[in-house]
Amino acid sequence: MFWVGVKHHNRRLFDGLIPLPHGTSYNAYLVVGKEKTALIDTVNPGFDQELMDKISAHIDPSKIDYVIMNHAEPDHANAGKEVLKIAKGARLVTSSKGKEAAMMYFDIDPSRIIVVDENSKLDLGGKTLKFIDAPWLHWPETIFTYLEEDKILFPCDFFGSHLAVGEFYADEYGNEKTLDMAKMYFAEIMMPFRKPGQNAIEKV
């Protein structure tokens, strides 16, 4: 599994309202199995090429089999349009509400969309992805993706924070500082959705 996201160091506002003193990041992940490859989420407008360059360090982007859209907001999904153009055999994997969003935002043949629910799994060959419905965290189409063999959860925005720093892991940056940023993010974005959040945590 490889992080292929982007750190946006000089972004100073989120949604035109929320100050970003430490910038933000757009987290995308490449999961390479023995048989197939999945890209989990993509990046914000303006960063398509950086995403492609990072993917290319590991595989030919045209060989991607699945683009998993946990969330349809542009900072997660926008570059999916470009990936699907390059990886002509790839399919978009999302929830039923995500399919509705993709049909509005992407120029995509509906036959290329796989709708998943909590009974769905994708076998990549030694790497298995399963899905958790997490509606209203913080849009209605949100899902989490779980990589079973490595026990890694890709929780979309839910455990997020706005950080674009040199360190990659919380203990490198500082656990207390990381927790402070996560609390701020929860208060600013997720607090109105705390009940759906509790429901999602119970499923994990």
Which functions belong to the PLM regions below?
Residues 86-88, 108-109, 148:
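Short, structured coil segments at secondary-structure junctions
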